[in-house]
Structure formats: C-alpha cells, structure tokens
Amino acid sequence: MGTTKMVSLLNHSLNVTTKDGRTFVGQLLAFDGFMNLVLSDCQEYRHIKKQNVPSNSVYEEKRMLGLVILRGEFIVSLSVQGPPPMDPSMRGSLLSGPGVARPAGRGIPLGQAPVGLAGPVRGVGYTAPPPPAGFGRGAPPPGFRPV
C-alpha cells in the first residue's frame, strides 16, 4: 500500500491479519515505511483447533490488548472495518465528566521540600575539603623525559 492510501486510513478501524493466523482489530494511530502499525483499543482474535476432539471443531479466542505496535514484517493482510470516529472536537466534549481538572494535593506546600530532601543548612557543619593537588599545568608527568 502506498503512503497516500495509508494516510487516508489513519483513525479508521482496521482488521489486520498476521502470518501466524491471528487477527487484530483496532484504530490505526500511526505507521511507518516498514509498515509497522500502531493500533489503539486493539482486540486479538485467535482460531484454535481442539486436539482431543476428532471432529474439526474450531473456536475463536478473543482478548483485549489496548495499545499495540504490530511489526510490518508479520502483517499479511489489512482491511478497513469501519470509518473513523466522529469529529475529534465533538469527541472530546462527549468524554468530559463531572468535576474540575486540577492536581491532587499531597499535603506538602509547594515552596518547601520534604525534611529529608532539603539539603544541608547554611552555617552548620564544616566546609568541603579542598580538591587534591594535581601535577601542575603543562608539566610532564614524573618519569617522562621530553625529547
């Protein structure tokens, strides 16, 4: 698929089949040149055959995965399952709930650090010792004789 076609599929609900037979259904958030896909609200469907039963009984196992990155190397087919959700500006207004968005207070005033994390108090204790003396600037190390 060309990138123009893939760009038109952004936010659509896709049905992606992989080499091992699994099917992933989710909303396309992103893709790259290697055909790696990022799907949100993804569900995985697997067809499982029962080993002990002689008849060809196959059942489908479904599990909710959430946000998934599918490697393009393993993708066999890609089909559109549904259109993108309604306008993003309307979608945000529908999801808001009661209350006011503000950070949760943790009981610590903003201007102060906790007691153990405050650091040393000025004027208490000794100063730091001086750094160790070096060899001097530009002088060769001991035992080295310039030519």
Curated annotation (Swiss-Prot):
Disulfide-bonded cysteines: none
Highest taxon above the source species: Eukaryota
> One GO molecular-function annotation for this sequence?
snRNP binding
Q: Where is this region: Disordered?
A: 87-106, 128-147
- Main subcellular localization, coarse class? nucleus
Q: Which UniProt keywords apply?
A: Cytoplasm, mRNA processing, mRNA splicing, Nucleus, Ribonucleoprotein, RNA-binding, Spliceosome
Entry-linked Pfam families: LSM
Q: Name a single GO biological process.
A: mRNA 5'-splice site recognition
One GO cellular component this record assigns the protein to is: spliceosomal complex
Q: What's its job?
A: Plays a role in pre-mRNA splicing as a core component of the spliceosomal U1, U2, U4 and U5 small nuclear ribonucleoproteins (snRNPs), the building blocks of the spliceosome.
List, alphabetically, the PANTHER family matched.
Answer: SMALL NUCLEAR RIBONUCLEOPROTEIN-ASSOCIATED PROTEIN B, SMALL NUCLEAR RIBONUCLEOPROTEIN-ASSOCIATED PROTEIN B AND N
Q: What is this protein called?
A: Small nuclear ribonucleoprotein-associated protein B
Species assigned in the record: Schizosaccharomyces pombe (strain 972 / ATCC 24843) (Fission yeast)
Name of the coding gene: smb1
